[in-house]
A protein has these predicted regions:
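Short, solvent-exposed loop/turn and secondary-structure capping segments
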Residues: 86-89, 152-156, 196-198
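Sec-dependent bacterial lipoprotein signal peptides
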Residues: 1-2
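Extracytoplasmic/secreted proteins, especially bacterial periplasmic and envelope-associated proteins
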Residues: 94, 98-105, 118, 122-129, ...
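Surface-exposed acidic, glycine-flexible loop patches that form ligand/cofactor-binding
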Residues: 63-68, 130-138, 149-150, 174-177, ...
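Boundary/activation segment at the start of structured domains
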Residues: 5-141, 220-223, 276
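Active-site-proximal C-terminal subdomain of hydrolase catalytic domains
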Residues: 183-269, 275-276
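A short, glycine/acidic-enriched catalytic loop
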Residues: 122, 147-178, 239
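Active-site-proximal beta-strand/loop segments in catalytic clefts of secreted hydrolases
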Residues: 75-80, 113-118, 143-148, 160-163, ...
Length: 277
């Protein structure tokens, strides 16, 4: 299966004072027979095929039409410790803790699964918690840091600690089913661009890597994209999700351009007006 890079390329730009050393995330290694991999793949179900997005609030001319949701719920996943040792990462659990701190500061009720607790069943339970919690007028968020890979025939997937491929169609069928029209979705993982194809009305989605690698910043104990995103919202006044995503993208691209490397962070904005987190 295709995942992140199979080589841990280390970059330490002399003039890159923000991130210091950057490490390319290693490839998700899966030597199981394809039949077994297929049995460890979760894909969209017909159960959610009749979903219709809730009607968004009216456009206010550029501001956030729902700046003060009645309730806010965030489900956060960070996986550095995978089954076995071949696929372990370094800072994804730190990414999750930093995301938790930020979302808590914004008034969110948090549910979080880290490392070996983030099984496929746990992620499904967490996504169902978002669906069960959300009501019209509420806001939800999902944030993931860990391995991303391509599932044969199903495209971009995130990987649970017990090595299930959670495909973009499967994850988004839950997220899109939440009965509210203010939704924030972030992935710090490799090759997760297919998730944007499922981005529904009311959602602001930001991805660290559409079709290339993601990177870690060991000196800062973060994924590079997560570092820039947190830096934007906490230190540079990026209170709107669109601005935070743009700030993170610009930071990664500016660094990569110094070394003629290609990175592909991007965002898809289907929220009406500006998204005040």
């Amino acid at each position: 299966m295709l995942g992140c890079s199979d080589s841990r390329q280390i970059i330490s730009p002399a003039d890159q004072t923000n991130l210091g050393q950057l490490v390319q995330r290693p490839e998700f290694v899966d030597n199981r027979p394809q039949a077994i991999i297929s049995s460890f793949t979760k894909y969209a179900s017909a159960e959610y095929s009749a979903y219709k997005p809730p009607k968004p609030p009216p456009d206010t001319g550029g501001g956030d039409p729902n700046p003060n949701p009645a309730h806010k719920y965030a489900y956060i996943v960070g996986i550095s410790d995978y089954e076995g040792t071949a696929n372990d990462l370094q800072f994804c659990d730190d990414d999750a803790q930093d995301m938790k701190s930020y979302f808590q500061s914004q008034g969110f009720t948090i549910r979080m699964d880290l490392d070996r607790n983030a099984t496929a069943d746990a992620v499904e339970a967490g996504l169902n918690w978002l669906v069960a919690s959300a009501a019209p007028g509420d806001e939800i968020a999902f944030a993931y840091s860990g391995h991303g890979a391509k599932a044969q025939g199903y495209g971009s997937s995130i990987i649970s600690t017990d090595l299930w491929y959670l495909t973009h169609g499967w994850v988004m069928q839950f997220f899109n089913a939440a009965n509210c029209s203010k939704k924030h979705f972030t992935l710090d993982a490799c090759q997760v661009g297919d998730f944007s194809s499922n981005c529904a009305t009311g959602t602001m989605m930001a991805l660290a890597s559409a079709n290339t690698y993601s990177y870690d910043a060991p000196d800062l104990h973060n994924g590079a994209w997560t570092y820039y995103w947190i830096d934007g919202v906490e230190n540079h006044g990026k209170i709107y999700a669109e601005d935070a995503a743009t700030y993170a993208e610009a930071g990664m691209k500016a660094w990569a351009s110094l070394y003629h490397l290609r990175v592909s962070p991007n965002h898809t904005d289907k929220y009406t007006g500006k998204f005040d987190i």
